[in-house]
Amino acid sequence: EYTIVRYVDPLTGATQDENPLMAIDLVQEYFAKIRSQLVSEEKLETQNIIANPGIQAYYMKNRGDAALKVDLTPHNPLLVTKTGTIAGFPENEFILRQTGKAVNVKMSEVPVENELEEVEHEGKNLNRGLRDYNVVSNVVCRLTNESDGHSASLFGLGYGGYIITNRHLFKNNNGTLKVQSQHGDFIVKNTTQLKMVPVGKTDILIIRMPKDFPVLPQKLRFRAPANEDKVCLIASNFQERYVSSLVSETSSVYPVGNGEFWQHWISTKDGHCGLPLTSTKDGFIVGIHSLSTITNSKNFFASIPANFEEQYLAKLDQQDWTANWKYNPNEVSWNGLRLQENKPGRIFQAVKEVSALFSDAVYEQGQEVGWLFRELKDNLKAVAVLPNQLVTKHVVKGPCQCFIQYLNESPEASAFFKPLMGQYGKSILSKEAFVKDIMKYSKPIVLGEVDFIKFEEGYNNVLRMFHDIGFEKCEYVTDSMEVYKNLNLKAAVGAMYTGKKQQYFEGMSEDEIHQLVIASCFRLWSGKFGVWNGSLKAELRPLEKVQACKTRTFTAAPLDTLLGAKVCVDDFNAQFYDKHLTAPWTVGICKYYKGWDTFMNKLPEGWLYCDADGSQFDSSLTPFLINSVLRLRLEFMEDWDIGARMLSNLYTEIIYTPIATPDGTVVKKFRGNNSGQPSTVVDNTLMVVLAMNYALAKLSIPYEEMDSRIRYFANGDDLLVAVEPTKGGEILDSLQASFSELGLIYDFNDRTFDKTQLSFMSHQALWDGDMFIPKIKQERVVSILEWDRSTQPEHRIEAVCAAMIEAWGYPELLQEIRKFYAFMVTQEPYSAIHAQGKTRYISERALVTLYKDEKVVLSDIGPYIQKLAEMSLGCVDEVVMHQADSMDAGGSSRPPAPLVRQQDQDVNVGTFSVARVKALSDKMMLPKVRGKTVLNLQHLVQYNPEQTEISNTRATRTQFNNWYDRVRDSYGVTDDQMAVILNGLMVWCIENGTSPNLNGNWTMMDGDEQIEYPLQPVLENAQPTFRQIMAHFSNAAEAYIEKRNSEQRYMPRYGSQRNLNDYSLARYAFDFYEMTSRTANRAREAHIQMKAAALRNTKTKLFGLDGKVGTEEEDTERHVASDVNRNMHSLLGVNM
């Protein structure tokens, strides 16, 4: 009711205008300071204040002519009231409260404003402004020391590769130290290895962490406390599922004793030791909480010495301890708020928004208790929320029905295939499977296990090896179109987007793509993280993994990160592929054309071989190993400071990735590689190579002796090792422990002297008498036949052909697949494709050429040519003879080119000339005028118009253009708005048809809102008919129905009314569908039947009622009085 209140001090005349809801104690404090100041200046007597301690309040309204006067005096809880009881409320003693009744006064009686300037300025300095304390809270660590049966837990401050904490953490020092921080959870297994420095005589200790501890930002500033300081206590709340920041109220400080400890008045609890006290004046840390009295009535902090930065922190940097960490530590300690601030710019057209983890909307939707959120712990923390869902649609549709039919009809084939079936199944796409796999990233990181001197030796050996194989300086790929061409356009755009990249880039110009690449690079350079999408991989998995609910997760990079990432890594990766087998990796190898044989021959004969496959490889990679890959890449990249910063920020994002999960939670991981980053295989391979060189350095095997004692090849997490037979076993025995020190889980017990027993990249080497050929297991080949993942019949045919290629080397299996293929092409819908000559025949000679890289000569393909000749003789009447010369009777005469036998071709085709038959013969009967042909045959041969463009069932382009322009003008919209309206019109017509008898309005939806548009401009401007106009939309409508069916069962109303039961024909169930020669027979029959059913018993009147023809006629009837009435005569009593 009242908008402002003016407080007036009757003793000083001072006033203060405030909101009526202002806390009265602040007002009371304001006037008390004014009175104190005047007393000290001897302008006011203390007795006057005692006699008249109260003030007055005038409540006023906007534009009102009256005010309400209220007297305010200090509350006396012992005052006896009119009712005979005391006032009470002793906790409010001396606080101003209303005394007596309020009195209405005129506005003219309200004292004029009189705020004292000097006091106002003083009031401005009472409280300081906003300050960002995230710089401090982001480096707060929680430390737990478990030694000698005792456990102590407190906090510390991360600073580079060091932690600043309390000395009393290590009353016992013979156990493990667990470190929880905003860049992960770590475990130091042996605290006696830690080097520590006490700071003066205070309770402050600096711990030097092991070298594999990722360095933290070094932005903190320290100084000694001062008497005038006000401080606040800052903490990080390490919950099991997330981390949040905490800030206390401010407190004054006071030195105790000789100043090594200071007292503060902030409430604390056990375990709060080590938390920093930060000055609100400048943000400097002045001490860390250390002591409390037994009754917790007083708290003390260890003060920072005056020379702390110069004497301690500056000397720490002199040790060059953090020199080898190349990732950007300033971008590590991000949180959900940072994700919201770093959302992709408008140029990327993101459609989803990241929201805070515990916003009001989150509480309403219950997202904070999502099925994954409940399971989070350790090194997986929830940071934000992003709308998402679990995709359970599988790319593997199910068992191949054609293969099942073949086995049912062929007992011999069934007896052969059944033992090889059932070994693979569809991966499980469930919540449990996702939780099981994603939680592999939650394991704490073990520190201090690595021998850093030996690791540097191994790293330098890898550098030397790169130089020896001729690895050259790499460039940053700044050609935007080159980046675009190397994208997988069938993949999704990202977690904050919808659809595939192909649709995203559709219609974009080169300049627009270039701007996208620049924007992505700028995001990387700025340290802005994109939100990656975590999903389950839909694939065929071995049966034991399916039964154990083990499904691999895929973490895909968003477009806003991916483009810039490819700028940084693509050139290095391309050169890395080219060096396969020259260097100890097979990334980029082609297993065909003797590729696998070359690979196997790289392993010395008679050595001891071992194949090792990493377990939980991606999730076990530590920041230390990934940082080593970054060091190696920067070593071979061109000198460009912008590119180096982009690359460093990229690998920071790869380690500390924000992942959007299916339950809507965005989690932050602190270890491991991402399977969907553009360099996963190369980076994983490099880390295995680094691990191998570290292990060899620990064995003290010099670089020069490596080739004579060990050979190895890596591909991602796959590793193949060959060691000389005398002492090689000792090398293999030591590898597992060395790999484990780096966090990698490998088993090196699968050993053999037979190369054909080795398994590498799921392939084995099969010796066929001449060479090694790569083979996958027969059960895996059969799974291609057993399971159908094709969306089109042509793709299924290609899959069976791929199975034939993979089966070469298993003669019986290949022959059985050929039998199935022969059966398959006789069944619908494959028979129609076969009839068009679109099914492939893969000959034995082609397979030999593919695997063995042998040249094909005429004698090899002679039997095939002979068989084809016999087949053609049985089908045609004409005999075609090979001649010395061939002549084109309808073309210009020219001497035949000499036939020269060409050498070194994959297939020699230059030995015989084949007669050509003209497409149109001039012997046919053609229309003529005065003896001259009226057709241009040369034009006719090339004239192949699109059927729909010349069909009279579709409006011409001119008619469609006129219709479009008139409808757009009638609706008064732009071309961009019209594009959306036509989407709605097409979908409405799919449901309601295009009958000329339509009237009224048509509707489309905008979210939950229904919008109506008049039909009149749509119909009256349609020439020749509305159905012929809508025929232009036929293909789009067909694709739209398919899209709807891919999401859920959908049958247009036109098909439902005809009781169409086959949902595979739903795409043809609309009345403006355009039939062409490409329409399948079954679909054509179904559409015509639906059309016939819709038109049954329909009558169309050629003429309506003619309103111009009159119906008047002259009445010539004559009546007499004896007639019955005016319309009836009477004849002897008979009515006529």
Swiss-Prot record:
The record marks E122, G123, Q365, G366, Q883, A884 as: Cleavage. Disulfide bonds: none annotated. One of its GO terms (biological process) is viral RNA genome replication. Residues 607-731 form the RdRp catalytic domain. It catalyses: Hydrolyzes glutaminyl bonds, and activity is further restricted by preferences for the amino acids in P6 - P1' that vary with the species of potyvirus, e.g. Glu-Xaa-Xaa-Tyr-Xaa-Gln-|-(Ser or Gly) for the enzyme from tobacco etch virus. The natural substrate is the viral polyprotein, but other proteins and oligopeptides containing the appropriate consensus sequence are also cleaved; RNA(n) + a ribonucleoside 5'-triphosphate = RNA(n+1) + diphosphate. One of its GO terms (molecular function) is RNA-directed RNA polymerase activity. GO terms for cellular component: host cell nucleus; viral capsid. Its EC number is 3.4.22.44, 2.7.7.48. Residues 123-341 form the Peptidase C4 domain. Keywords: Capsid protein, Host nucleus, Hydrolase, Nucleotide-binding, Nucleotidyltransferase, Protease, RNA-directed RNA polymerase, Thiol protease, Transferase, Viral RNA replication, Virion. InterPro entries: DNA/RNA_pol_sf, Peptidase_S1_PA, Peptidase_S1_PA_chymotrypsin, Poty_coat, Potyv_NIa-pro_dom, Rev_trsase/Diguanyl_cyclase, RNA-dir_pol_C, RNA-dir_pol_PSvirus. The active site is at H168 (for nuclear inclusion protein a activity), D203 (for nuclear inclusion protein a activity), C273 (for nuclear inclusion protein a activity). SUPFAM superfamilies: DNA/RNA polymerases, Trypsin-like serine proteases. It holds the Pfam family RdRP_1. Belongs to the potyviridae genome polyprotein family. This is Genome polyprotein. It comes from Ornithogalum mosaic virus. The lineage of its organism: Viruses, Riboviria, Orthornavirae, Pisuviricota, Stelpaviricetes.
